[in-house]
C-alpha cells in the first residue's frame, strides 16, 4: 500500500485552482476558456489523482486504491 503525506494532498488540491488563476489572469477570457478546456482534457488523470487525494484527506488512508 502507498500512503501520501498530507502536504502532498494539500498541494494537489491547490495546484488546479492556482493554475486556472494564472491562465485567466494572463490571457483574455475567450482564450483562457479554450486553453483551460484543452488543458483539462490533458490533465484528466491528474484530476482523478486530486479526487483520490481529497478522499485520502478525509479518510486518512492516502492513495490506497482498492
From Swiss-Prot:
GO cellular component terms given for this protein? extracellular region
Q: Where in the cell is it found?
A: Secreted
InterPro entries registered for this protein in UniProt: T-conotoxin (IPR031565)
List the residue ranges forming a coiled coil, or say none.
none
Keywords from UniProt, A to Z, are: Amidation, Disulfide bond, Ion channel impairing toxin, Neurotoxin, Secreted, Signal, Toxin
Modification after translation is described as:
Contains 2 disulfide bonds that can be either 'C1-C3, C2-C4' or 'C1-C4, C2-C3', since these disulfide connectivities have been observed for conotoxins with cysteine framework V (for examples, see AC P0DQQ7 and AC P81755).
Q: Which family does it belong to?
A: Belongs to the conotoxin T superfamily.
The task this protein performs is described as: Probable neurotoxin with unknown target. Possibly targets ion channels.
* Record remark on domains: The cysteine framework is V (CC-CC).
Q: What is this protein called?
A: Conotoxin Cal5.2
